[in-house]
């Protein structure tokens, strides 16, 4: 697990104005990915002798970030996007023009109430997530994928959802 200083800035793959509130998305996801690849992962390998498959799991905007990395690098062999922010502007166009870089297992999940919101930007998360699953099912680099709907809204049982994603990914190997 790792933390970032600026959630909206460090996990967003590109710049966008705020979808709600006034905290814009600064588009520093590429810098975060470079830090993972050039600093954190090599340090973990050196300090702990970790030399096996690497999974990236994220929740909310970190879930979008995790999924985005599968299109940007071949370093991760499994991805989980739990309640991923697939409502993010231009995400649907992005996935149509990019390919998954590494043979991967990819887990998607969403709360059943997440798309039932008055915010029109956030309301598209359900359709976008279902579309993402269809795209992944047809991607030759994706070994297995699933989309699991959980009860509740975005913040309901976040830890339980993350555990479910880890369990599914481990069962795929």
Where are these regions (language model features)?
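Gly/Ala-rich beta-loop-alpha elbow adjacent to hydrolase catalytic centers
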Residues: 57-62, 66
């Amino acid at each position: 697990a790792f933390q970032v200083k600026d959630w909206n800035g460090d996990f967003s793959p590109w710049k966008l104005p705020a979808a709600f509130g006034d905290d814009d998305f600064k588009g520093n996801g590429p810098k975060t990915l470079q830090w993972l690849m050039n600093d954190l992962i090599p340090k973990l390998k050196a300090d702990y002798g970790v030399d096996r498959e690497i999974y990236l799991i994220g929740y909310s905007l970190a879930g979008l970030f995790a999924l985005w990395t599968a299109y940007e690098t071949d370093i991760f062999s499994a991805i989980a996007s739990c309640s991923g922010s697939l409502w993010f502007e231009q995400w649907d166009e992005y996935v149509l023009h990019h390919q998954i870089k590494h043979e991967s297992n990819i887990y998607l999940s969403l709360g059943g109430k997440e798309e039932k919101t008055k915010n029109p930007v956030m309301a598209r998360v359900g359709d976008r997530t279902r579309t993402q699953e269809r795209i992944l099912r047809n991607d030759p680099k994706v070994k297995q994928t699933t989309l699991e709907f959980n009860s509740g809204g975005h913040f309901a049982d976040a830890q339980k959802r993350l555990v479910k994603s880890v369990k599914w990914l481990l069962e795929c190997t």
